[in-house]
């Protein structure tokens, strides 16, 4: 492509990728990235500041566009120049996916946070306060039931004494045999 036939307005509308494609096509040899950038700046009439502002996006576009290939050492060429068998790109072996282990079901449901009451919210509900007071009264009434517990303790002591007597009689019977 001859850029002399285009007007300056038409050249400004050309993308950097289109210019690189035609430059590489005219040269018919791989070129370093820095040389490509210099030629683009010359053809499009870009200042160094404009080039610096666009260089990152240009490099990204160059990598993404399937028409170009990086030959190493920052040299770029057209992919159409190289048959697939000749391309000496670094090919990394793909790791084999690991086999998934069968997870045993534990029988428990997963904890769902939605069911949990939000105790941090204050809604001004007085009914809850009444429930707490009722529970306090019930607990006070249960405190007086300690007498029943004492009776149970005495029953356990009596049972333990009977058990000891039984063990002694068993031992005597075994000795007689």
From Swiss-Prot:
<dbReference type="InterPro" id="IPR029757">
    <property type="entry name" value="RpoE"/>
</dbReference>
<dbReference type="GO" id="GO:0000428">
    <property type="term" value="C:DNA-directed RNA polymerase complex"/>
</dbReference>
<keyword id="KW-0548">Nucleotidyltransferase</keyword>
<dbReference type="InterPro" id="IPR038087">
    <property type="entry name" value="RNAP_delta_N_dom_sf"/>
</dbReference>
<dbReference type="Pfam" id="PF05066">
    <property type="entry name" value="HARE-HTH"/>
</dbReference>
<keyword id="KW-0240">DNA-directed RNA polymerase</keyword>
<comment type="subunit">
    <text>RNAP is composed of a core of 2 alpha, a beta and a beta' subunits. The core is associated with a delta subunit and one of several sigma factors.</text>
</comment>
<feature type="region of interest" description="Disordered">
    <location>
        <begin position="93"/>
        <end position="177"/>
    </location>
</feature>
<keyword id="KW-0808">Transferase</keyword>
<dbReference type="InterPro" id="IPR007759">
    <property type="entry name" value="Asxl_HARE-HTH"/>
</dbReference>
<feature type="compositionally biased region" description="Acidic residues">
    <location>
        <begin position="106"/>
        <end position="177"/>
    </location>
</feature>
<protein>
    <recommendedName>
        <fullName>Probable DNA-directed RNA polymerase subunit delta</fullName>
    </recommendedName>
</protein>
<comment type="function">
    <text>Participates in both the initiation and recycling phases of transcription. In the presence of the delta subunit, RNAP displays an increased specificity of transcription, a decreased affinity for nucleic acids, and an increased efficiency of RNA synthesis because of enhanced recycling.</text>
</comment>
<keyword id="KW-0804">Transcription</keyword>
<dbReference type="GO" id="GO:0003899">
    <property type="term" value="F:DNA-directed RNA polymerase activity"/>
</dbReference>
<comment type="similarity">
    <text>Belongs to the RpoE family.</text>
</comment>
<dbReference type="GO" id="GO:0006355">
    <property type="term" value="P:regulation of DNA-templated transcription"/>
</dbReference>
<dbReference type="GO" id="GO:0006351">
    <property type="term" value="P:DNA-templated transcription"/>
</dbReference>
<feature type="domain" description="HTH HARE-type">
    <location>
        <begin position="14"/>
        <end position="81"/>
    </location>
</feature>
